[in-house]
């Protein structure tokens, strides 16, 4: 496992004008040394972390030796979003409500700058990680060769904002806030068909607990004490690369090859929403490409349908 390393930033100005006295940005490096090979930045999703490869790597089917993102060919850099507390309580932050996806993207650029790299071959991320990738492209529109936002959008939708409200109510009123919020979120990431295929309305034990209930409770317990989930939900709501900016100019300015990847059954970031963004980009640039994963599994398909995702990414990384 690659060692977790840290960069400490002092007096970081946030989008809302607050100055954060100290921010610790942790990360892991995989593959080739930064500067010796094309750099691939991988942004983790809501409950992910910087461990993208290996036995516990959340994208181990995509990244590693002789895989689509081949660590024998690329330098792979994965940051931890400040506040996720991955393997370090020091990575927790108290005033999570002050941070937006823009602020996280800006911190990631500061982290990349510490390696003295001016050009990034690819920034890829799913869900929240993809939203941060969009923000990174808007901040430095000429610095990324390939932008790959997966199962995400460049602006929070009404559906997403509404579900953030439900999450906030759970977090503020439940006796087991993170546990219960996670259970609700798990249903947003799947579809009725996905759960039916997985559980078949079967009982888990003689006490009358259904397998789907046991699965949901397990995920609630697993996340408890591991994440500040409320921080993540708030950041999703704050996604908007056009905030206080000229929409058309932002779109025109992004020089990257933009590969928008949707899931046809995603309720969280719908395929139609992502396709609409693609069509808008095509009005001004010819550097956008639309791809759609077919799956019964909904939003989480980007963590499940690896064969389809591999086929989409193969031409980019070969």
What are the functions of these language-model segments?
Residues 1-39:
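Catalytic-loop region of hydrolases
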Residues 28-86:
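N-terminal cap/lid subdomain of alpha/beta-hydrolase-fold enzymes
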Residues 102-121:
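Conserved acidic catalytic loop of the alpha/beta-hydrolase fold
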Residues 119-158:
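Conserved hydrolase catalytic core segment
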Residues 143-222:
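Alpha/beta-hydrolase-fold enzymes
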Residues 254, 260-262:
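Short beta-strand/loop motif that positions the catalytic acidic residue
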Residues 267-273:
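Conserved alpha/beta-hydrolase "acid-adjacent" motif
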Residues 275-318:
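Catalytic active-site module of serine/aspartate enzymes centered on a nucleophile-bearing elbow/loop
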């Amino acid at each position: 496992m690659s060692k977790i390393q840290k960069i400490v930033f002092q007096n970081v100005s946030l989008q809302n004008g607050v100055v954060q006295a100290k921010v610790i940005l942790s990360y892991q490096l995989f593959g080739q040394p930064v500067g010796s090979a094309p750099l691939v930045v991988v942004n983790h999703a809501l409950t992910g972390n910087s461990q993208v490869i290996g036995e516990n790597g959340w994208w181990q089917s995509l990244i590693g030796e002789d895989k689509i993102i081949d660590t024998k060919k690329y330098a792979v850099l994965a940051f931890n979003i400040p506040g996720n507390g991955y393997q370090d309580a020091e990575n927790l932050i108290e005033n999570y409500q002050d941070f937006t996806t823009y602020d996280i993207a800006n911190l990631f650029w500061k982290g990349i700058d510490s390696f003295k790299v001016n050009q990034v071959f690819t920034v890829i991320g799913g869900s929240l990680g993809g939203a941060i990738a969009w923000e990174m492209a808007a901040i430095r529109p000429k610095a990324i060769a390939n932008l790959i936002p997966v199962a995400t959008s460049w602006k929070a939708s009404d559906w997403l904002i509404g579900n953030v409200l439900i999450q906030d109510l759970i977090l503020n009123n439940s006796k087991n806030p993170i546990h219960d919020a996670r259970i609700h979120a798990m249903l947003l990431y799947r579809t009725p068909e996905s759960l039916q295929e997985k559980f078949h309305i079967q009982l888990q034990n003689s006490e009358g607990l259904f397998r789907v209930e046991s699965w949901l409770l397990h995920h609630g317990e697993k996340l408890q004490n591991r994440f500040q989930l409320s921080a993540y939900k708030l950041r999703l709501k704050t996604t908007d690369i056009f905030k206080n900016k000229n929409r058309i100019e932002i779109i025109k300015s992004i020089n990257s090859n933009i590969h928008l990847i949707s899931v046809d059954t995603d309720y969280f970031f719908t395929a139609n929403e992502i396709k609409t963004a693609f069509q808008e980009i095509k009005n001004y640039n010819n550097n956008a490409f639309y791809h759609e994963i077919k799956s019964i599994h909904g939003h989480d398909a980007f963590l499940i349908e690896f064969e389809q995702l591999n086929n989409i990414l193969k031409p980019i990384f070969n």
